[in-house]
Structure formats: C-alpha cells, structure tokens
Amino acid sequence: MRGKWLRLCLAAVLIVSLLPGLGAGEWKASAAKAGDILLSHSFEEGTTQGWTARGGVKVDVTAEQAYQGKQSLQTTGRTEAWNGPSLSLTDVVHKNEVVEISGYVKLVAGSAPPDLKFTVERRDRNGDTQYDQVNAAEQVTDQKWVKLQGQYSYEQGSSLLLYLESTDAKAAYLLDEFQIRLVKAAPENPGEPGEAGQALFKAYFEDGNIGNWRARGTEKLEVVSGIGHNSNRSLKTSSRSETYHGPLVEVLPYLQKGSTVHISFWAMYDEGPATQVINGSLEKEFNRDTANLEYAMFASTTLNKGQWKKIEADIIVPAESTGISGLRMYAETPWKQSSEVTETDTIPFYVDDVQITATEAIAIEKNIPDLAKKLGSSYALGAAIDQTALDPKDPHSELLTKHFNSITAGNFMKMDAMQPTEGKFVWSEADKLVNFAAANNMQVRGHTLLWHSQVPDWFFTDPNDPSKPATREQLMQRMKTHIQTIVSRYKGKVHTWDVVNEVISDGGGLRNQASGSKWRDIIGDVDGDGDDSDYIELAFRYAREADPDAVLVINDYGIEGSVSKMNDMVKLVEKLLAKGTPIDAIGFQMHVSMYGPDIKQIREAFNRAAALGVHIQVTELDMSIYSGNSEQEKPVTDEMMLEQAYRYRALFDLFKEFDDRGVMDSVTLWGLADDGTWLDDFPVKGRKDAPLLFDRKLKAKPAYWALVDPSTLPVYRNEWTASQAKVSLPDRKGQEDIIWGAVRALPFSHVIEGAVGTTGEVKTLWDGKQLNLRIEVKDATRLKGDQVEVFVSPEDMTAGKKNSTPKDGQYIFNRDGGKGKDQKLYQVKENKSGYVVYASLPLSSADLAAGKVLSLDFRITDKQPNGKTSIVVWNDVNNQQPQKTENRGKLKLGFDLKHAKVMYGTPTVDGKEDKLWKKAVTITTDVKVTGNSGAKAKAKLLWDEKYLYVLAEVKDPLLSKKSANAHEQDSIELFIDLNKNQTNSYEEDDAQYRVNFDNETSFGGSPRKELFKSATRLTKEGYIVEAAIPLENVRTKESKWIGFDLQVNDDGAGDGKRSSVFMWSDPSGNSYRDTSGFGSLLLMKK
C-alpha cells in the first residue's frame, strides 16, 4: 500500500493548500522521487488488493504456492487469451512518468506452457482504446517462478487498466510480489491552481477515517477493510431505506466558482441483483437557503455485481453571481418514490478513489451562425433549461441567448415546484426565468399547469383528513386557484402555456387512476353530458380567464408516431372545440429517435392537427441514438452523428412546410446540449444518450450544421435492402409483374435544384443476372428532357477500383423512351400522376450474391413549362454524380423475398385440420430473432371476405406460461398490415394478435378484438393454433396484397423467461411496432 499512501499524502497537501486563505497560488509540492515504490502487492493480507477478473474468469488468493510468503494471486477458468487478472492504474501512474512494472508468475500444475506479458488498456474520454505492451512475452511453466518486468510511460489517456495475458487461452497461473516503481518523475510544472489535470480534491479512505463525509439520511457510513479499489479500504454505505441514501461530502471550498472540473469516483456492490445502477449527483445550495436545495445527476453507470466501475463527468461549478453557498457530491441509486422502493433499490454499496480535477473550461463557439436567425423561420425556436442557464456567466446561458429565442423551464415551473404546499407558491426560479427572457427579448413557454406526474399529493386529499380523497369541488377549486394564480402573475410575460400535459393514455382514451392520473376520476362529468373530460375543459377556461392573450396548448407525447393515440387526441380536441374550449394549439412533444417514426407519418399527424383549425407546436424535441429500450449503451460514432444530422434536417424541412402554411407556432428542443439531456439514464438505467444539437462540451454537432449549412457535412450514405426474386418487364399490354406488389418502396424527394414537388419512389429486386428496378415519378407535365438516371456499381468501386460498364455505372432512362444506349434495358409507362420506369440492369454474377453491397443512387430531372428544371436525388445531396461514387447510397442484396399466394377458403376455427387446409400454402418460421434454437412453426393460410385464416403447428417439447408477461409465454404472434404501407411505426390498420398454447389472447396495435377467433390443441410435439384474423376492404373478384408475419415465442427452460423467437420474415425484433419487415401475402381472387 506504500504507493497509495504516498499519493494520498501528496493529495492531502494539495487539498489543504486550496482551502481559502492558505496561499494556494504559491504552493509547490514535493513529488514522488525516482526509486519510490508506488504500489506493492504480496497478497499476504488474503485479499486480491484491487485485482479483478477480465472476462469470465476466477481471480482469488491461494495458499497453495507463493514466490515469497504464503499466498499468491491465482487466475483460473480462462477461455480467451485476454482473460486474466486486471488492475486499474488510472490513479497510480500519471502522464509522462516512467515506471517499472514487475511481478513473478508461475503456472498452476497441469497447464500447457504459454507466453505471458503485462499489457495496459489505455482509453481516452471519447472511448478510443490503445493497448500498450509493457514487457517482452516470457515463456512460463509450472516448475519455477518467472519475473515479468518492463518500463511504461504514456502521454495521452484518461483511464489505464493493466492486465496479464497469455498466448494460451486456457492456462491457469499465479502472480506474486507485484510492484510498480517510479523510474522517472513527470516534469514539475503544477502552474496555477485550476490548471487542467490538477487534483483539487481526493478521498482514498486508507487512513480508516470517514473525514467530512456524512449520510444523507438514516443510513450507516463506515470505512471498511479488505474491500477497496486498488487498495485495502473503501467507504461503505449500508442500512439504506431510500434510493437517495448515500455518502455526501461538501466540495465547494476546494473549487473555483465558475470553473470546469472533472469529478470521478469508483463504486462497487456485492449483494443483491446481477446489475445495479449507481448515480453520481450534486446537491446545490444558494444564498445559504437550505430549504430550497437543487439536485442534479452528473453521471450514471450500470455496475456488475462484485466489480468496481468508474463514474465520471465534467461539471461547471456555479459562478459567484448565482449565490452558490454549497456544492455537495454524493452517490445514490436511481430515484424512486418511497412507496415504490424495493430491497433491490437499497443495496449496500462501496465508494473509493474519489477525485476532482481541474479541466479545460467549457466554452461555446462564438463565431458560428446564430441558429434561430439562420433558420429565418416565423416560428419561435426554443430550448428547455435548468436554472444554471439563467446565470449570464454560465456558458449554457451564452449558448441559449446566442441560438434560441424562446425558453421553457424543464422542471421548475411544474406543479410540485410552483406550489409544493397548498397556498404557498414558490416564485423565485420562475421569476428569474421570466425576467431573463424579458432582458434577452425571448418568448417564454410555461410548462405545465396541469399534469398527472410531479403533482403534490395534497391536491387529491381531503384537507382535514389526508387518508380520504378530495371531493370534486375541492379539486376543482384547487385546480382553478393553481392555474389562475400562476397565469395571472405572468400575464403578458409568458407567451404560451402547456395547459394540460399527457392526458391521453397509451392504452387508449383519457388517463384515469389506473393509468396514473386522478384528475378524471375525481372531477368526472361535471356538466352531465356523459363525458368525463370536463377537467381538461375547465383547465383551459381557467387559463383563458387569467390571460386572454396567452396561447393555450394541449401537449402530449407519441402522437406523431402512434395513429391510435393521435386518433384519441383528434377526437378529444374535436369534442372540446365543439364545446367552445379555448384550445389554440396541439403540442407534439416529439421525443423521436434516429430510426422512427418516419417523416411521412409525422406529416400525416401534423395534417390531422391542422385540419382541426388549431396550430402546431413541437414542444420537447430530441432524437435518441437508440432504437428502443432493449438497446444497451453504445459509443457515439461520426457516422451515427452524420445520420442523426440528416434526420434532423428532414424534420426541420417538414417544420418549414407547416411554417409556410402558417400553422407552425414554435419548435422547442428538450435541452440545450447533450450534457443536460433527460435521456441519460432513461429509459435504460446507466445509459447515456446524445439526442440534441450541441454536444457535452457545448460544441455544435453535425445536426446543428445540417440546419445552418448542410454543405459543410459529408454526404451521408443511406442504406436499403433489395430482396431476391425473379421479375419480368411489363408485357405487351403494359401489365406489370404482380410480384412488384410484394416489394416495399423507397421514397426519395431531396431537391437539388428547382422547386419542391417532384418526388420519386423506387422498388428493387435482384436475381443472379440483373438488378431490377421499378421507379415511379410524380410529375404531372410530360416534357422533353424528363428523365431518370440510375448510378450503380459494385461497392468496392468506392475504394478506387476500375469503373464498371457502362462508364461510371450511369444509366439514363428518358420519359419518352428515347433512342439512347440504354433503350433496351427499360420500359416507361405513363399514369395519372406521372410515369413509371421499369428497368433490368445486367451486372456481373460476381457482384450479385446475398450479402453483397452495390453503390447506388437515383436522380430525377423534371423539365417544367416555365423553362426551369427541377432535380431530385436519393442520396448525393451535392449532386456530384457520376464522378463521386463514394457519395452514393448503399444497396444491400438480401435473401429471398418473403411472399406467398393464399387461396380462398373458409375453414372452421376449432383447432382441427379441415379438408380445406390441404390446398393451402405453407410457410415456416425459419428466421431467427433471438436464441440459437427453440420452438418453430409451420403454418397454412387461407382467406375469405371476412378473415385471414392461419393454422400453425408448433413444435415445442416443453410448454410454459410461467411468466406473467404474455410475450414470454409459449405462444404465436400474428402481425397484419392491411394497407401494406410497410411503415416504421404502426398505422390504424396494423395489428398484433397473440395466442398462447392455452388459447389465451393478447393484442397490440389496432386489433379488432371482438371479431378475432382462435382455438388451440395440444399435440405430442407441441401445440396447434387455428386463428381467424379480421380483414377489411377485400373483394373476392380481385387479388390483393397485404402485409403479414408469424412469430413463435418459446420459454425453452420453463423458467418464465423467453429464450427464443423465430419469425417467418422479419429478423429485427421490432414487429410489434414496425411493419416494414413483414412478409407479403397475395390473397388470390376467388
């Protein structure tokens, strides 16, 4: 422990020197000297002394053998060369020091002789990793101890992990008498206090004292021996009964107000679940007011049981002008209300190696265009903020006033913040925001007057007996008082109010107590018209009375991507408007992702809102880099940020459409920058996100540049997949091949030149000889010069290989058929809205195979009656075709097109196979989603005017419905897309029907539950499900394509956990919300 003691003593000198009045600026410490032992491990104390497993191995102390003494460190159970013992050196070896790392190693008896060496895994704060070899690999046997020794130094990096690796993946070995010796100290240049990298505060707990740390509640804090990170001691927190219980320490005396610092600590737990999230948080006190403290999480991470992990982030210390009088860091588990806290939430945990260092100050880019001004829109562009953005000296404030002209309080104008106790309103923070906005000529959006969340319990209880609910009259009066007191105070100062927030239930209809809201249940139907949405009507009327000129908004999430939820919103607003309710706008929160919902669906939702006669506001916009709740944290890559940038551009192009129509009021980003996003730690604990226009250092991301100057960005390469199937050009009568109806269309409409209007839509198929295209162009005027160009070549051409034939892979298809060199490769068919090009492009068989990628782009030229030209492309927004093959999109050649022809027939739904089923087509669930093996099904299909019939025989030897979750039970799921729009999110015609082996049903999307039929029967090999799925708008005299998929869920172990999922078509696992991967069924005419 000598090395750690040395570092601790130096840190103690440093901390004392930074206390006020102690002449910190003149301090110079005596550093460690050459020859000093920084770290020494003999393992005689019986602990691993901070060494942990790298990979699925066992690392423990053994008394079987030792180089000196009686014990050594043993590593067993290895399966990979890199598996072994590891030790963090982050706080042991510093930049530019030269150290000698050594240790004695020997094999456990019976292991094959491998070569062993020490390696350092070195990471920077962006996650980039280097692997530094410390010593030459030495052959080691089980006969004698071998010394591994080498010198090590580094210049860049934020974390160091030393590990022992072997050329043999299975060898078990011993380590003893490990040490790190300082060979050469780093150059002495501490500079002024606050220089980047300088330690300002450290807590190692090796002296056995808690120091100034204290509990936040009734929990117990103690320094324990035998458990530590790279040491023998750490700070343990136990007897916790609340999630916020944890160790806390005051750090403000050690920090310069207004500076940027890096906070880090290591955490570990060894009781309870396999994983647990630990948060690093701050408690802020202003003007010595201990009654109104502010809390903020600065970092969060998911720990694995028994393994230490670092929690770290940069923070900005509040400036002197804020009145900051206390800044305390603490550790906790994710917050829950007391009534929801479980034993898992209150596990004991350990903290060690706490450190705060100075870092480069965070500053905004002052020489880039002002975002709101550059957009030049008539709608307000805003951001949601916390209180730090109201401090003019904080860089977040600078970012806000430079780029935005509207502000929203993220949390401090919600109900619990404004009136925590009945009759006692808290005005301080809201007043600051309103005054700040006035001083900077900004609009204010008030968020929110009424919500089911973050509302104090007293609203809903009897004032004389809190055990009883409030009466209708009491709750109505409280609502009126709350709304009118706040709106009256800020009359003429707050431009817009979110009057009610999130009143639509995800399960359909208005929220009630079962879905988290008591407003509807208590107030109910006041006017006796049979409708219980009266509390919403009253809230709007109260707000209008208090400020007749404020814009009043009904705000909700998910309505841009859920047709059923938007249906509920439209019905509600129609009904309220008919009663004269003063609703001015519908607020679309727009918490979207890079993957959905698609622009087409958002446009449709906006159109439906505008059709009601109200305006549109985008109120909480952000764009997650994750596809859903099941995705774990991933590194942020340049390609990912470029993809996000182009999606942001598409969204703002859509906003411009509605701004030009005069119905877009405002667009608000839910946060200023990624360092303050609410999506960190939500919906997945410990997961960081990057959803906004500015990064964690407040620097402009590609998404910002996509809005102000897209030409500065590289061209993003869109991707699409072509299925394999043979297809013919239209016959002599112009009839197209029916197989095109099974193919999903790729729309493109990026205007390079001219006016918006012309659009394209392409379908792709491939076979062993050619790439087949169906390109539909919307262009109402047929003029000479109208044409479609296709640019296609093998993907490896982008690496500089010789171009294919034709030159540069360019094909020109004239609308009039023309006489060009490509005339024999295509046909053109006119239709009501424009024309369709059918083309078969011969390519080398070497380039046409599943998994191959083609470089592809499309360009439409539209000649217009006024002599001008409009040009639209799919991918190359710089219009540098055909020369720039690297600017083309990617077309991946996929597997067989999943489609089937379904014959007409009406079987009896009883779980038995009628004779009719003998003529039915059969499909199989052979596409893996999860699990390497498990239950699968063969299914037959029939249809009539009312139903699609499915007879599925599932092979599943162990049947289970142990889980309370329907999707984890042994079952099949039937997905249907009646209009075959193949969208990234469900439309009103899309539905999910689930039937388990015991004929218990559950549903998703927009099912017609009352018409659905099913029957099940157990078999020797599993079970049979026969089902009838309701159809709409089908005719027996014509064939019709619909979207369909079949899924089999299997709890293979019978333990209540789904172990495998197999599908007919869609491997994505998103079929419950996304119809784009469904297969296609052709309902053959009778």
From Swiss-Prot:
Gene3D superfamilies: 2.60.40.1190, Galactose-binding domain-like (2.60.120.260), Glycosidases (3.20.20.80). Residues 35-183, 197-359 form the CBM-cenC domain. CDD domains: CBM9_like_1, DOMON_like. Keywords: Carbohydrate metabolism, Glycosidase, Hydrolase, Polysaccharide degradation, Repeat, Signal, Xylan degradation. It is an enzyme of class 3 (hydrolase). Optimum pH is 5. Retains at least 50% of its maximum activity between pH 4.5 and 8.0. Is not active at pH values below 4.5, while at least 35% of maximum activity is found in the pH range 8.5-11.0. It comes from the Bacteria. The keyword Calcium does not apply. One of its GO terms (molecular function) is carbohydrate binding. Residues 1-31 form the signal peptide. Pathway: Glycan degradation; xylan degradation. The active site is at 502 (proton donor), 556, 620 (nucleophile). Disulfide bonds: none annotated. GO terms for biological process: xylan catabolic process. It catalyses: Endohydrolysis of (1->4)-beta-D-xylosidic linkages in xylans. Optimum temperature is 45 degrees Celsius. Is only stable at 55 degrees Celsius or lower temperatures. Retains more than 77% activity after 2 hours incubation at 55 degrees Celsius and pH 7. InterPro entries: Carb-bd_dom_fam9, CenC_carb-bd, Galactose-bd-like_sf, GH10, GH10_AS, GH10_dom, Glycoside_hydrolase_SF. The keyword Transferase does not apply. SMART domains: Glyco_10 (SM00633). It holds the Pfam family CBM9_1. Its EC number is 3.2.1.8. Residues 365-710 form the GH10 domain. Belongs to the glycosyl hydrolase 10 (cellulase F) family. Consists of three different domains. The central region of the enzyme is the catalytic domain. The N-terminal region contains cenC-type cellulose-binding domains and seems to act as a thermostabilizing domain: a derivative lacking this region shows a lower optimum temperature for activity (35 degrees Celsius) than the full-length enzyme, and a reduced thermal stability that results in a complete inactivation of the enzyme after 2 hours incubation at 55 degrees Celsius. The C-terminal region contains family 9 carbohydrate-binding modules. Endoxylanase with high hydrolytic activity on birchwood and oat spelt xylan. Xylotetraose, xylotriose, xylobiose and xylose are the main products from birchwood xylan hydrolysis. Shows increasing activity on xylo-oligosaccharides of increasing length. Displays very low hydrolytic activity on Avicel, carboxymethylcellulose (CMC) and p-nitrophenyl-beta-xylopyranoside. Also shows transxylosidase activity, allowing the formation of xylo-oligosaccharides of higher degree of polymerization than the starting substrate. This is Endo-1,4-beta-xylanase C. It comes from Paenibacillus barcinonensis. The gene is xynC.
